[in-house]
Regions:
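Signal peptide-proximal N-terminal region
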Residues: 1-20, 139-143
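Residues that mark the start of a beta-strand
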Residues: 19, 115-116, 171-172
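A structural preference for short, hydrophobic beta-strand core positions in alpha/beta folds
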Residues: 20-22, 147-150
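Short, well-structured alpha-helical segments in soluble
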Residues: 22, 29-46, 106-107, 156-169
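Extracytoplasmic ligand/sensor domains, especially the bilobed periplasmic-binding protein
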Residues: 30, 44-148, 197-215
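Hydrophobic alpha-helical
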Residues: 54-65, 170-192
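Internal alpha/beta domain cores that form substrate/cofactor-binding pockets in large enzymes
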Residues: 145-149, 161-164, 168, 181-196, ...
Length: 215
């Protein structure tokens, strides 16, 4: 984003200079709302872009819509951001989690041949929507869901859940959530002897996942 702004300014095509104002939403809806309110209160702000975290985006889009500030979502993938509210000034360049879960489901069932799954999802709007997306997709392809467990964001000890899941002997464990909880689950799967495939969509794609979960 910063590179695009610098290139636009260097091109000489525009009779003005574009300035980027970067604020940290901390992947927290309340922090994101505070940042959005700060931006829309500045008359020099003409457009905005964000977020990585879906619950944050779902909290801020109403502010940008109310203040008529065009808003482009670059990372958050909850479908309701654009699919439910349909604010004309809110658009996305990222796919939705439904679009991500489809190919993932095709791969793990169609290509790997796995049929029995345990699901762990967090209780955020992002996690709940992943559960709602993946489960019917998998069952529609003939898969069996052996267990579903919901966890709060910030949970650090998943061993009781994983020990139960180990006894069910699924082919794989699907996770609907983001980096830290996903990494801890993957790490603790090894520690309880649950040597099965762990898989999820792009919410876990971060160097921190590999750092915590290990190879």
């Amino acid at each position: 984003f910063d590179l695009a702004i610098r290139e636009a300014n260097a091109s000489g095509k525009y009779p003005y200079k574009v300035e980027m104002v970067a604020l940290d939403d901390a992947s927290d809806p309340a922090t994101g709302v505070a940042a959005a309110l700060k931006l829309v209160s500045d008359p020099a702000v003409v457009a905005a872009s964000g977020h990585w975290n879906s619950p944050v985006a779902l909290a801020t889009i109403h502010i940008f819509h109310t203040y008529k500030i065009p808003f482009i979502v670059w990372g958050a993938i909850h479908p309701d951001i654009t699919g439910f509210y349909k604010y004309p000034g809110v658009n996305r360049v990222a796919p939705t989690l439904i679009q991500e879960n489809g190919p993932l489901c095709d791969w793990v069932i169609g290509e790997l041949g796995f049929k029995n799954f345990s699901i762990i999802s967090d209780t955020s709007s992002y996690g709940e929507m992943n559960l709602k997306a993946f489960r019917p997709m998998a069952e529609g392809k003939g898969a069996k869901i052996l267990s579903v467990d919901s966890v709060t964001v910030g949970t650090t000890d998943f061993r009781p859940i994983l020990t139960k899941v180990k006894g069910l002997n699924p082919d794989a464990v699907y996770f609907g959530g983001v980096v830290m909880e996903g990494a801890l689950i993957r790490d603790q799967m090894e520690k309880v002897g649950l040597k099965k495939l762990f898989f999820a969509i792009s919410g876990i794609k971060d160097d921190k996942f590999l750092e915590v979960a290990g190879p």
